[in-house]
């Protein structure tokens, strides 16, 4: 469960993202139930320290490529002990440091918002 102080930040970025993308946050407590909640036609990105690290501009290009493919984009953040997800299409790293999974959610949402602002040519990214 998401706890303060992260709740306010998550809600803030969900509101900001609403005009750019459909965002649905789903919490699953048990690792074995994660795969069942991923849409069938989804491009699934597992957040993993060993994944691809993007700067914000490259991440915005990644988002645009996924949008053009017509597939749903699904990001999966594991719990405190990580997550094995054999069906994941791609792995993304938010950086080399370990983050609490609740903070990782905030960072991911902020980067999604930043990426959409970059794609729209709107001021935010600097």
Give the positions of each predicted feature.
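N-terminal beta1-alpha1 ligand-phosphate binding loop
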Residues: 1-17
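Short histidine/acidic/glycine/proline-rich micro-motifs that form metal-
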Residues: 1-4, 50, 98
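Residues at secondary-structure transition points
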Residues: 8, 54-57, 98-103
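Short, glycine/charged-enriched secondary-structure capping and boundary segments
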Residues: 8-13, 58-62, 88-91, 106-107
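Structured adenosyl-cofactor binding patch, chiefly the S-adenosyl-L-methionine
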Residues: 81, 85-126
């Amino acid at each position: 469960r998401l706890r303060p102080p992260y709740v306010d930040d998550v809600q803030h970025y969900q509101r900001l993202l609403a005009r750019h993308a459909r965002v649905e946050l789903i919490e699953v407590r048990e690792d074995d139930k994660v795969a069942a909640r991923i849409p069938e036609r989804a491009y699934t990105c597992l957040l993993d320290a060993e994944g691809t690290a993007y700067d914000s501009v490259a991440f915005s290009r990644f988002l645009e490529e996924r949008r053009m493919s017509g597939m749903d984009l699904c990001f999966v953040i594991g719990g405190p002990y990580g997550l094995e997800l054999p069906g994941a299409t791609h792995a993304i790293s938010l950086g080399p440091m370990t983050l609490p999974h609740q903070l990782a959610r905030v960072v991911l949402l902020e980067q999604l918002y930043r990426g959409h602002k970059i794609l729209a040519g709107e001021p935010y990214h600097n």
